[in-house]
UniProtKB/Swiss-Prot annotation:
This is A-type ATP synthase subunit B. GO terms for cellular component: plasma membrane. Belongs to the ATPase alpha/beta chains family. One of its GO terms (molecular function) is ATP binding. PROSITE patterns: ATPASE_ALPHA_BETA. One of its GO terms (biological process) is proton motive force-driven plasma membrane ATP synthesis. Keywords: ATP synthesis, Cell membrane, Hydrogen ion transport, Ion transport, Membrane, Transport. SUPFAM superfamilies: P-loop containing nucleoside triphosphate hydrolases.
Length: 461
């Protein structure tokens, strides 16, 4: 039966989990948008996951609760899901499917763009090399974020990743340029209180004016979580590559996204992979993470900070494990530091920004940045070794230089790593604290910094 704007079918073979299986379907296409109508006239959106042998498997975004085989119709609308985009999306709050959630009307659209995006031609990619200042010392100083990079945060259940995500969203900026900067924030499967915190945090700081907020809460259908990062990245790509803005995309929590993917896979009775996740989890995650970058001839950039909570703090779990293969480093939050009350509790010895070397130094941050960072990494690593030794032989068994390294570890955690959630430090302040840490050591222990920088910045205590 042909309906206005599409083809309508009423022969539903089966409803299983979030899926509706439609019989006797002709000419349906993969990813095609479907309107599923209930007996009460309620319309729910879905998309085609699989077509073959006259059947179509439809994934219903709002869930299948209340649907019956006898009284459900499915209209195949003949197009893929698209997100309306324009400059007017800035300052707006949307739900996980891209519908307004702030009580305001739909923004006037300049374009309608397929949420799956266009793959970036590797030949057209430009190497990321420009510094983004987050105002968080440990990131700016030791795990530097670069425009066009994808740098995930690996956290654990109950830790302070949401505070860190909101702080980065409020404070992030590009320095040394007049280019426009925007933040696209997508909350995926978060609690209502967390969603409200993100909204209030951006509103009260004034950062919402340059931001676009997508909120998918825990009581929304799990299947909606598959769509949320894609609509967010569609908006980010439009702002970056059509309007020439530098866009930071924060996605939290990607673990909830992967759980939704596992739910769909189980409903389709696919052969499970590691821990029940589908075998294509790596490929699916790459379709999200690889949408970060810069393009030759385009002024803007898309930078991603995906956040995921590691089940049981297990960094070898499939989600962080596969994420690490695709992205360019990781920021790992440590449970021990969190228990000590350190914020942000970043374990720098497990963290890395693979593109840091290209975004720092003279002309970007400061000429001594790379060397002072390496020296502090070395000193903090030595401090951890000394702490372990002190746990065995006691402080009385330590040498004078060992005690100095212990002091370095304490100053690093209490003055550099720790900062208030509303404290926005410049890169100059961050580097100043790093030199204060190094100055706790005798000059002959400083082996990774050129003498000219030591002469300029070192102040022995």
């Amino acid at each position: 039966m042909t309906a206005e704007g599409g083809v309508q079918y009423s022969k539903i073979a089966e409803i299983k989990g979030p899926l509706v299986i439609v019989d006797d379907v002709e000419n349906a296409a993969f990813d095609e948008l479907v309107e599923v109508e209930t007996k009460d006239g309620e319309r729910r959106l879905g998309k085609v996951l699989e077509v073959g042998n006259g059947k179509a498997i439809v994934q219903v975004f709002e869930g299948t609760t209340g649907l019956s085989i006898a009284a459900t119709n499915a209209k195949f609308v003949g197009k893929v899901m698209e997100m309306p985009v324009s400059r007017e999306v800035l300052g707006r709050v949307f739900d996980g499917l891209g519908r307004p959630k702030d009580g305001l009307p739909d923004p006037i659209a300049d374009q309608f763009i397929d949420i799956n995006g266009e793959p970036m031609n590797p030949e057209q990619r430009e190497y990321p090399k420009d510094f983004i200042q987050t105002g968080v010392s440990v990131i700016d100083g030791m795990i530097t974020l670069v425009r066009g990079q994808k740098l995930p945060i690996f956290s654990g259940s109950g830790m302070s990743h949401n505070l860190l995500a909101a702080q980065i969203a409020r404070q992030a900026s590009v320095i040394g340029t007049q280019d426009d900067f925007a933040v696209v924030f997508a909350a995926i499967g978060v609690q209502y209180s967390e969603a409200e915190y993100f909204r209030r945090s951006l509103e009260e700081s004034g950062a919402l004016k340059r931001s676009v907020l997508f909120l998918n809460t825990a009581d929304d259908p799990a299947i909606e979580r598959i769509i949320t990062p894609r609509v967010a990245l569609t908006v980010a790509e439009y702002l970056a590559f059509e309007l020439g803005m530098h866009v930071l995309v924060i996605l939290t929590d990607m673990t909830n996204y992967a759980e939704a993917l596992r739910e769909i896979s189980a409903a389709r009775e696919e052969v499970p992979g590691r821990k029940g996740y589908p075998g294509y989890l790596y490929t699916d995650l790459s379709t999200i993470y690889e949408r970060a970058g810069k393009l030759n001839g385009k002024k803007g950039s898309v930078t991603q900070v995906p956040i995921l909570s590691m089940p049981s703090d297990d960094i070898t779990h499939p989600i962080p494990d596969l994420t690490g293969y695709i992205t360019e480093g990781q920021i790992v939050l440590g449970r021990d530091l969190f228990r000590q009350g350190v914020y942000p509790p970043v374990n720098i010895l497990m963290s890395l920004s693979r593109l840091m070397k290209d975004g720092i130094g003279e002309g970007s941050t400061r000429a001594d940045h790379g060397e002072i960072s390496n020296q502090v990494y070395d000193a903090y690593s030595r401090a951890q070794e000394v702490r372990a030794l002190a746990g065995i032989v006691g402080k009385a068994g330590l040498t004078e230089i060992d005690l100095k390294y212990m002091d370095v570890g304490d100053v690093f955690e209490n003055e550099f790593l720790s900062q208030a959630t509303d404290e926005n430090r410049t890169i100059e302040e961050t580097l100043g604290i790093l030199w204060k840490i190094v100055s706790k050591l005798p000059r002959n222990e400083i082996t990774k910094i050129k003498d000219k920088y030591v002469d300029q910045y070192y102040k022995e205590e």
